[in-house]
């Protein structure tokens, strides 16, 4: 839907105004322009474009640049409160040179800064800038007469550029905004940083928090470049010391009523780089053209579990006599450095603490595979082991993360964002999975390019909850499929319970062309897919079953316009044990979805329909109540977290009622108590339910109703 405050740009059609209207011409837009790259040229282990390494300096610079022209004049604490609350985020994005060529400046922003790191990208970016109606500041590591070098770029240079833009072209915006912009620009001065007692250890495990602290106006203590240790505990201490320093800033700043206007962003980011899933395979070193030292170093990367690096004398001797291995190690170091800078930039925009994990979290996948195979077993006696296998998986996760990091999360609470491939949603926090304890969202670490696009984020969109009651439901079940009618029946029941409240567009499709036509023809902000999902079988293809064929959603990117919210009621759309990153959930993100709710395990047709029924009922009833109780906006992550918690509570209480554990009608009273706890955003909501049985004379805690009995948790992205 168009912005309520569009700016009509001279020379642009009304259609373009609707599509590209900029509601805030005081915002500064930053573009990282890269050369076009083929997929087969991405980095080997995590899938980054090779242009990222040549722009890593730009990520660090962005962390200290203002989001808009008024920002440098605001009191620091007031600015930080806005950032913590979800406002004043940077508008930045990576873009290929060919895509830039197809854009007009007005489609990008009013005041624009470009960064380039290669000669071809710099040349094309400069040519594009020369065609635009307003000047564009071009910062490049490639020295040309029309570019600014990274070393010369600073707040004063940016100020002078912004002043020139608003003086010469301020007539294109409203007079009051032009006056405000020019008045603020004249008052720009570098802030005097606040010193804190934290040494600047030069290591990628602490760098993200250093970026956060510098953007928060803090200066660090003694710099120790290229810091390292042979003691794993030293890394843990350094990570948590830097993360605690960020939390101290948040505590000192506090919140104000302005935070009610914005959604709360994650306060903790859990991150760990990963290899492509297939890259963990040992393979057969016999017959390989790689030198033994190179094979040895790749194996070390595959098997690494801690941050401390120890190498045996024999291995060291191998490295001394062969230099080929350096290329593989350098590539992996580059990937890690890019993720480090990207995560740091994302966290810096909301003053979030970054907790780097240990590579051991990526080694729980054998446990995942064992658990997932058991869930899929046809024999019900085999599936009886599922709770035990889930417990083993959670224990392995807890060991990999470590008690110190878990204590940090417990101490400060959520919201939490995961930037990792590991299933950290299942990490036990006081007996409850992380995703049920705290509001949790995720960005996958592979492929790297997709991760960086998600880290760039988007300008938040605020809507009335009633706008979300228009839903497209696409069903692809065959006519003879026994699961075909469960969703339709659930939606009919929803209409009986909440008559006239929803606009449900239910469409059945039998071909890929029909699917694309239905999705493109809908204006609903939410799409629910009801059908069969197919997990990657090891050949790099996970998809949806439509018309008897498996459809790779990624291949529809040039044909399909994806709605912002996608909910997948299909099996294994981001499988726990998927052998590659090519999942349905990832694919919908890659083709344009803002958020995806995917499944990590098989789901029954009846259970999937029940979940959708509850989720939509939740939108209509819980969301307005939560807004009233919390007296602020709520995020989509909070909405979905509420669905998961209340669904689990309802399942537990129904289970106990069927067993005769709870007296008649007492389950409703207990559920109302849980509902109040969830409405209050209480992370102890599960304990509230477990203890509330005392009012009915029942000790719920003495019965087997732990969440491990309900292991099929959906997975969600921000």
What does each of the following model-derived ranges do?
Residues 415, 525-526, 565:
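Structural motif
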Residues 28, 159, 167-169, 175-183, ...:
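Active-site-proximal C-terminal subdomain of hydrolase catalytic domains
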């Amino acid at each position: 839907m168009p912005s309520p405050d569009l700016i009509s740009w001279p020379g642009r059609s009304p259609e373009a105004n609707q599509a590209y209207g900029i509601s805030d011409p005081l915002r500064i837009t930053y573009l990282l322009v890269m050369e076009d790259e083929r997929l087969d040229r991405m980095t080997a282990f995590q899938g980054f474009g090779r242009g990222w390494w040549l722009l890593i300096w730009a990520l660090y610079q962005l962390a200290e640049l203002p989001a808009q022209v008024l920002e440098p004049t605001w009191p620091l604490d007031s600015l930080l409160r806005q950032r913590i609350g979800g406002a004043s985020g940077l508008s930045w994005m990576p873009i290929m040179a060919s895509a830039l060529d197809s854009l007009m400046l007005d489609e990008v922003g009013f005041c624009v800064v470009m960064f380039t790191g290669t000669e071809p990208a710099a040349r094309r970016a400069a040519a594009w800038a020369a065609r635009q109606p307003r000047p564009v500041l071009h910062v490049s590591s490639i020295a040309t007469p029309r570019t600014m070098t990274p070393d010369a770029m600073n707040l004063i240079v940016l100020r002078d550029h912004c002043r020139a833009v608003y003086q010469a072209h301020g007539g294109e915006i409203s007079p009051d905004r032009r006056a405000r912009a020019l008045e603020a620009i004249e008052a720009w001065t570098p802030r005097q940083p606040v010193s804190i007692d934290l040494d600047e250890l030069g290591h990628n495990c602490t760098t993200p928090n250093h970026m956060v602290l510098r953007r928060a106006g803090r200066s660090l203590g003694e710099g120790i470049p290229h810091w390292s240790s042979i003691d794993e505990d030293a890394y843990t201490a350094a990570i948590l010391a830097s993360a605690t320093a960020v939390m101290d800033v948040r505590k000192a700043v506090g919140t104000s009523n302005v935070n009610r206007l914005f959604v709360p962003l994650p306060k903790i980011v859990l991150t760990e780089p990963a290899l492509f899933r297939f890259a963990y395979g040992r393979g057969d070193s016999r017959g390989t053209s790689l030198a033994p030292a190179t094979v040895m170093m790749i194996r070390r990367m595959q098997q690494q579990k801690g941050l401390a690096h120890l190498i045996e004398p024999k291995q060291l001797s191998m490295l001394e006599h062969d230099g080929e291995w350096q290329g593989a190690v350098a590539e992996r170091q580059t990937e890690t450095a890019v993720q480090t800078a990207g995560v740091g930039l994302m966290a810096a925009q909301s003053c979030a603490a970054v907790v780097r994990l240990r590579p051991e979290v990526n080694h729980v996948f054998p446990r995942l595979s064992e658990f997932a195979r058991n869930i899929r077993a046809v024999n019900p006696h085999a599936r009886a082991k599922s709770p035990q296998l889930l417990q083993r998986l959670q224990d392995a996760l807890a060991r990999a993360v470590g008690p110190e990091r878990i204590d940090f999360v417990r101490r400060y609470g959520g919201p939490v964002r995961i930037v990792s491939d590991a299933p950290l949603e299942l990490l036990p926090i006081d007996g409850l999975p992380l995703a049920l304890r705290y509001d949790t969202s995720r960005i996958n670490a592979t492929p790297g390019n997709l991760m960086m696009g998600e880290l760039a984020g988007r300008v938040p969109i605020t809507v009335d909850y009633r706008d979300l009651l228009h839903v497209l439901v696409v069903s692809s079940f065959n006519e003879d499929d026994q699961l075909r009618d469960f969703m339709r029946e659930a939606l009919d029941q929803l209409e009986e319970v909440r008559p006239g409240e929803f606009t449900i567009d239910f469409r059945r499709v039998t071909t890929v062309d029909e699917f694309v036509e239905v999705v493109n023809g809908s204006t609903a902000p939410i799409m629910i897919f009801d059908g069969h999902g197919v997990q990657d079988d090891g050949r790099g293809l996970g998809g949806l079953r439509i018309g008897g064929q498996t459809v790779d959603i990624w291949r529809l990117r040039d044909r399909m316009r994806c709605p912002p919210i996608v909910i997948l009621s299909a099996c294994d759309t981001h499988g726990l044990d998927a052998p590659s990153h090519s999942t349905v959930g990832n694919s919908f993100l890659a083709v344009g979805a803002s958020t995806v709710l995917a499944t990590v395990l098989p789901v029954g047709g009846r259970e999937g329909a029940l979940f959708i029924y509850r989720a939509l009922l939740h939108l209509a009833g819980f969301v307005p109540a939560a807004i009233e109780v919390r007296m602020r906006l709520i995020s989509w992550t909070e909405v979905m977290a509420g669905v998961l918690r209340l669904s689990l509570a309802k399942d537990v209480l129904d289970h106990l009622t069927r067993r005769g554990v709870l007296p008649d009608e007492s389950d409703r009273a207990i559920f109302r108590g849980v509902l109040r706890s969830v409405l209050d955003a209480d992370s102890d909501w599960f304990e509230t339910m477990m203890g509330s049985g005392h009012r009915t004379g029942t000790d719920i805690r003495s019965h087997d109703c732990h969440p491990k009995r309900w292991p099929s948790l959906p997975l969600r992205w921000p």
